[in-house]
C-alpha cells in the first residue's frame, strides 16, 4: 500500500489511536507506529507531543463511534475547520514522494499533523464510500478502533478473534436457554 494513499493515512490514524489510547504510549512506541506506516526521516517526539497526540486520538474516537455518515460528516467538518489548513503539496525537502498535507507546514506540531491528516483521510473515505470509514469493535471487552473500507456490510468487530468470541458467547447463551 502506498504510504501516502488515503487508505494508508486512515490505517495509520487507526493504528495511532490504538497505540495512544489502548497502550502506555511513549515517544519511542509512537515513533515505531509511525515507522511501521512508512514515515521516514527523524521522528523526534517528546512526551508532550505524545500527550497532545493522545488528546487528538480521543477526538478521533468520537468519529469512530458515529452512528451514521451524517453525524460522522458533521464531526469531520468540525475537525477540519478547527485543524486543517489549505492543502499543500510537500516532498519534505526531497525525502519522500510528493503528497498532500493539510497541516500548517512541515514543522507543524505532531498533534496538529495527526489530527488534520487523519480527519482529511477519513473525510475522503466517507465521501468515497458514503458511510463511516471506521468504527469501534462491538465486542464489549474490546472497543478498539478499526478501519472499514470494505464494499460489503459495515464491520462490527476489529478482528476475526473478537467476532468469533461474540458468536461463541451468543451460541452458548442460546444453548443454555434451551
Which residue ranges define each predicted feature?
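Short helix-coil boundary/hinge micro-motifs
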Residues: 1-148
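Short, glycine/charged-enriched secondary-structure capping and boundary segments
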Residues: 151-153, 173
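Cysteine-rich micro-motifs
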Residues: 153-163
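Contiguous alpha-helical segments
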Residues: 169-178
Amino acid at each position: 500500500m502506498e504510504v501516502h494513499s488515503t487508505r494508508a493515512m486512515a490505517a495509520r490514524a487507526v493504528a495511532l489511536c490504538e497505540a495512544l489510547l489502548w497502550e502506555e504510549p511513549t515517544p519511542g512506541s509512537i515513533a515505531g507506529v509511525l515507522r511501521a506506516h512508512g514515515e521516514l526521516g527523524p521522528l523526534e517526539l517528546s512526551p508532550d507531543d505524545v500527550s497532545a497526540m493522545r488528546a487528538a486520538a480521543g477526538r478521533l474516537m468520537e468519529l469512530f463511534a458515529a452512528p451514521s455518515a451524517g453525524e460522522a460528516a458533521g464531526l469531520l467538518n468540525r475537525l477540519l475547520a478547527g485543524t486543517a489548513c489549505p492543502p499543500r503539496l510537500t516532498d519534505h525537502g526531497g525525502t519522500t514522494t510528493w503528497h498532500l498535507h493539510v497541516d500548517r507546514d512541515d514543522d507543524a506540531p505532531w498533534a496538529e499533523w495527526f489530527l488534520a491528516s487523519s480527519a482529511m483521510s477519513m473525510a475522503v473515505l466517507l465521501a468515497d464510500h458514503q458511510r463511516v470509514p471506521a468504527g469501534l469493535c462491538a465486542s464489549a471487552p474490546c472497543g478498539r478502533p478499526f478501519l472499514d473500507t470494505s464494499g460489503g456490510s459495515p464491520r462490527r468487530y476489529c478482528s476475526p478473534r473478537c467476532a468469533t468470541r461474540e458468536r461463541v458467547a451468543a451460541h452458548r447463551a442460546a444453548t443454555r436457554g434451551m
